[in-house]
Design a protein with these regions (language model features):
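Structured-RNA-binding interfaces characteristic of tRNA pseudouridine synthases
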Residues: 1-250
Length: 250
C-alpha cells in the first residue's frame, strides 16, 4: 500500500468548500472521482484542512493510500486530463506509511487579498474583498503584531468550531500594500473556524479608523470580540502553504 501526497491548487468559486458532501459539488468530491479513475480502485482522500465555500487554495495538501502503481509523475499529467480547469494537481510524491495531510502538518499559511479602489474591478469579484475606502496599513500592522506568539483566540472563533482548544501560536502576521492591492499573510500552528477571516475583518476596522489598535488588543486579551459582525468575505482568502517541518525562522 502506497501513501501519496498531492499539492492541489483550486479556484473555490464554483464549489461548496473543500470537504466531501453528498449531492453537492465540492473540491474533494471532484478530486476523489478523478483519482478513483486513475488508480482503478476507490480512493478516499484526506485534506490538510477544510476551506469554506468560495475560499481558494494555492497549495492544499491531500493524501491518500492506494495499491495502484501509477508513477507520481504520470499521476500529475493524467489528473490534468480528468479534472476541471479550476482544480490542478501541482505535484505528487510518495510518502512514508503513516504520513497524513492533516495530522502530520506543523503549520499553515493563509493569504487574504484586499483591493482598494474607487471602482469595483469586475474581474476580481471572486478573488478579493474590494473596498472603496482607503486604509491605514501602518495601524493594521501595529494591530497584527499583537497576534504573534501563543494566545487564546476565542475572540476570533465563529460558532460551529469543532476545535477543542482555542490556544494557537502565530508565527507571522503582516500586511503589505502594492498599488491598490493589500495582502495579508498569516502563519500559525493551527486556526479556528473562521479565525483568519474574523481577524481580517477586525484589522480592516482598524484600518478604516472605526477601531483603534488598543481596541483590538483589548478584544484579544478579553477573549471576546463584541464588535465582530461577520467574517471577512470568503473570496479573499487563500490557503497558501502547509508545512511539515518546523516553521522557518527568518
Amino acid at each position: 500500500m502506497r501513501t501519496i501526497k498531492l499539492v492541489v491548487a483550486y479556484d473555490g468559486s464554483a464549489y461548496l468548500g473543500f470537504q466531501k458532501q453528498k449531492n453537492v459539488q465540492t473540491v474533494q468530491n471532484v478530486l476523489e472521482e478523478a483519482l478513483t479513475m486513475l488508480c482503478g480502485e476507490k480512493v478516499v482522500t484526506a485534506g490538510s484542512g477544510r476551506t469554506d465555500t468560495g475560499v481558494h487554495a494555492l497549495a492544499q495538501t491531500v493524501t491518500f493510500t492506494t495499491n495502484g502503481r501509477i508513477p507520481c509523475a504520470n499521476l500529475v499529467r493524467a489528473a490534468a486530463s480528468l479534472l476541471p480547469e479550476d482544480i490542478v494537481v501541482v505535484s505528487a510524491e510518495e510518502m512514508p506509511e503513516g504520513f497524513h495531510a492533516r495530522f502530520s502538518a506543523r503549520w499553515k499559511t493563509y493569504h487574504y487579498k484586499l483591493l482598494v479602489n474607487e471602482h469595483v474591478n469586475p474581474f476580481m469579484v471572486r478573488y478579493a474583498w474590494q473596498l472603496r475606502q482607503q486604509l491605514e496599513v501602518k495601524a493594521m500592522n501595529e494591530a497584527a503584531e499583537l497576534l504573534l506568539g501563543t494566545h487564546d483566540f476565542s475572540a476570533f472563533r465563529s460558532s460551529g468550531s469543532v476545535d477543542t482548544s482555542p490556544i494557537k501560536t502565530i508565527f507571522a502576521a503582516k500586511w503589505q500594500q502594492q498599488g491598490e492591492e493589500i495582502l495579508f499573510r498569516i502563519s500559525g500552528d493551527g486556526f479556528l473556524y473562521h479565525m483568519v477571516r474574523n481577524i481580517v475583518w477586525s484589522l480592516v476596522q482598524v484600518g478604516m479608523g472605526k477601531r483603534t489598535v488598543q481596541d483590538f488588543a483589548a478584544e484579544l486579551t478579553a477573549q471576546r470580540c463584541e464588535f465582530l459582525n461577520e467574517p471577512a468575505p470568503a473570496q479573499g482568502l487563500y490557503l497558501a502553504e502547509v508545512g511539515y517541518r518546523e516553521y522557518p525562522q527568518l
